[in-house]
Amino acid sequence: MMKILVTGGGGFLGQALCRGLVARGHEVVSFQRGDYPVLHTLGVGQIRGDLADPQAVRHALAGIDAVFHNAAKAGAWGSYDSYHQANVVGTQNVLDACRANGVPRLIYTSTPSVTHRATNPVEGLGADEVPYGEDLRAPYAATKAIAERAVLAANDAQLATVALRPRLIWGPGDNHLLPRLAARARAGRLRMVGDGSNLVDSTYIDNAAQAHFDAFAHLAPGAACAGKAYFISNGEPLPMRELLNRLLAAVDAPAVTRSLSFKTAYRIGAVCETLWPLLRLPGEVPLTRFLVEQLCTPHWYSMEPARRDFGYVPQISIEEGLQRLRSSSSRDISITR
């Protein structure tokens, strides 16, 4: 049994990681800003703190055998400084705390967005075949790229590191993406960008967690996966329109039937990016140029590097995942209403 710390253990993927690690017999502690009753139920210890506070992070990592660094500030828009503090400074604090406490293993949750390059497609490639993106105007992607580089550069004989890039995680327990999509669909405010024919990968939640456990089991100084990044998905690319509408159907929401052209959506995104900060409008920016590019571009990846280096094979197909989502959402009023 090991003592393992999960940053952001109260989130969607974080809870799946905590649940799986506890089931594997480990002592698990979550470091996050809030308090989550579900983690108490799982028997997970909780430490409240901010990743941007180096002393709090160093204290949390005392006596820890491995870290799953999953916490991040996500979202399509916001001040660069807020993303930099959470994603870059926070990650550097985790790395420094690993050094200070002699923690030998760090599994970092990254994102495929670090390779974003406008509308350039990524089709069937591994992470070592796709360079980091240029001009990452979205602060989330830009700061995650900086953080991932730092994590991989830190890999050495004392601290083994690996970065996983799960693509579009979905499934039961999602209290962010699917509920918002379903609400917009029911209100008639959801549009397809482009014709929706672009192939995209996605990752069922249990598969995303399993990839982390597989990497953890193989990670050690000098291991094949040490110091490397990997795309993670179900390995079942679907047209964007089909994926979105199958997810909506699973939560009893209407299909998307109307669309915006790329050019129109891109112009709207540019206007939103200008008006929201200028007028200090409340709420999240509804559309950005980065998001439009992501929605219209093929993004699907090779799982062969992850299979070869740490044995990752998706266990839950999209079809089975949708069935599980359908069963779960029928009991979850936040998604079905």
Curated annotation (Swiss-Prot):
Residues engaged in binding NADP(+): K144
Documented EC number(s): 1.1.1.412
UniProt GO MF annotations: oxidoreductase activity, acting on the CH-OH group of donors, NAD or NADP as acceptor
UniProt name for this protein: 2-alkyl-3-oxoalkanoate reductase
Catalytic activity from the UniProt record: a (2R,3S)-2-alkyl-3-hydroxyalkanoate + NADP(+) = an (R)-2-alkyl-3-oxoalkanoate + NADPH + H(+)
Keyword NADP: yes
Protein's cellular compartments: Cytoplasm
Top enzyme class: oxidoreductase
